[in-house]
Amino acid sequence: MIRLPTLRRPPGRWGRALGAVVLVTACDRGPARETDAPHPVASSAVTFNEDIAPILFAECAGCHRPISASATPARRIDGSNDVICIAGAPFQLLTYADAREHAVRIAAVTKSRAMPPWLPESAHGEFVNERRLTDRQITLIQQWIDQGTPEGDGPPPRPPVWPEGWQLGTPDLVLTLSESYTLRSDERDVFRNFVVPVPLPSSGAIFDTRYVRAIEFRADNPRVLHHASVAVDPTRVGRVLDRRDPGPGFATMPEGDVQNVYGWSPGKAPVLDPPDTAWALEAGSDLIVQLHMVSRGSSEAVRPTLGLFLSTTPPTSVPLTIKLESKSIDIPAGESNYVVRDSYVLPADVDVVSVYPHAHYLATTMRGTARLPDGTTRTLLSIHRWDVRWQDQYRYKTPVFLPKGTTVSMEFAYDNSYGNRNNPRRPPLPVRWGPKSTDEMGAVWLEVIARHREDSDVLTRDFFSRELLADTEAAELRARSDSANAAAHNALALKYMAGGRFDDAEKELNRALGLQPMDAEAHSNLGTLLQARGRLTDGVMHLELAARLKPNDDRIRVNLGNGRHAVGDQVAAISEYRRAVKMNPDNADAHFNLAVLLGPQGHVDEAIAHLRRALEINPRNAEAHRNLSIGLGLQGQVSEAIAHARAALSLDPQSVSARQQLDQLLGQQRPAAPNADLIGRRRNH
């Protein structure tokens, strides 16, 4: 994803499902574990009732059980009555008969540690809720098989009772996908994204923010749901993508300001985070739920539900995310040991709370390390047998302290040969970096908390600069290796623009147009760039052409409106903004730009309406608050005008105009005149 201005939370904050308060379910490790030190074989008989049932019930039955009759059942379109287990487990393990029938298979997968699914190596890091059998447990299972799988005396043990309903109590907010997605029987694996509007209860405050302590994910069809992630979309760009896609949801997670905040996988217990580490959810934001679904041979409907547990108390410790990643992945067909690396030097002392590695089907091994300033090295994570089906975020039992100057590094290896049984392409083909499951990725997200509160900004600024440089280098590589691809040059130009390299950006956009003269995106970007460089007429020419080529794109209409205004044609500018608002009512920039032109023309009521709409979508637009304050002041709504002036100043403490507006409203000067400046900085797409 392209994420420019801020240090971000981890994808899925995947580990936000793990926290200081641990609710133990059958798929969790439980409160206490034995070490993996060798254990002698028991001299007495090993029986199911006494020895094996406790292991299976604690470590396996959480997934190897039917969906509860009182839970929302999986909806089988084919009408079959087969037992459907949680997470698509192939059989249940709740009785002696179950265990005896599958005893040989159980012995094999536990001995190889393929089950329970847990990827990190035991010697590197202790994590919350580890799903790992001890050596003694594995030995007991093997001995039970050798002894002929005896049941034992006495009554059969009772299986665990799993919580019904919401495990964390009644949520403050319950959200369900607006429509079901039907997974066809012939679909191998599907990633699909769904917009979920968040109707936060209003507190009456200017910044109507809630703080999320937990998300509890209820899979209505865990048989086919492999995993899910939840992201916050503050700009509502997901709604645009959803409207453009004819089916339920849309295919690719959007780029930009979308921030992943939660991840779910089968068997993961929901956990209520402490109030001081909750994450902010602004009014007006949407959630985007990404579902990874795997067909089980029949058409099935999927429509999960989310429960949000909210707080009104701002957190005292806000986790940030350091992302190590290689976007230069280009694996030749047949290559069995392709390696990528990345590293970052910490500019401040941090505590590492969790680590989340991510790759697709070709990855084999992963390693994350920290080299401290004194020269010592600590392994943060080591995975020797990667399996994308069981990806997760791993939360340390005790946060790992890393001092300023520590170099954190990642190293991933990939196998794109016939020998990799997980390779989805037969015969193997070259594979590059990309978001699709048939592409490859290589990233590690470290969730960290700055030891000193003031260092959070230091981390954010430093990491943004570093990531922009890395993204630019990746875009340069793609443009060189795929020089006939206009989109690659356009993407590189955007990176150059973000870094202030305007000459280079203009060259790349001209290259893109040389390859694709009718590329609307490139014309729009070039027009915006030329306008910013003072070449107004040339800029408008490119923007007009972009609008003709792509007449229903609200982003291009906003840029053309800005171009019209820059050359003094306010009537045409207003017309373009109105078109953009009609095309996409959730385009905050269109509402804002329209308002700042309508106000000085005396259309204060309409300007106020558009400013309110812009702030409903993006409540942290300081210029929108300032302009709304002016409009409300002109209408005599002084109290609300003061509130918005203060909001503008809190968002932009250096704003002289916001300070002057507040002073005027507080009576130190006369109220602003109608032409005082109901025009803020226009916003481009």
Language-model segment annotations:
Residues 27-201, 207-210, 218, 284-290, ...:
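Aromatic- and Gly/Pro-enriched helix-to-coil junctions and flexible linker segments
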Residues 634, 642, 646, 650-685:
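Terminal, low-structured helical/coil segments at or just beyond the last alpha-helical repeat
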Residues 487-497, 521-532, 555-566, 589-599, ...:
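Conserved alpha-helical positions within TPR/SEL1-like repeat arrays
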Residues 475-477, 509, 543, 577, ...:
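Hydrophobic/aromatic packing residues within the alpha-helices of TPR/SEL1-like helical repeat arrays
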Residues 88, 122-127, 156-157, 161-210, ...:
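Beta-strand-centric surfaces of beta-sandwich/beta-rich domains
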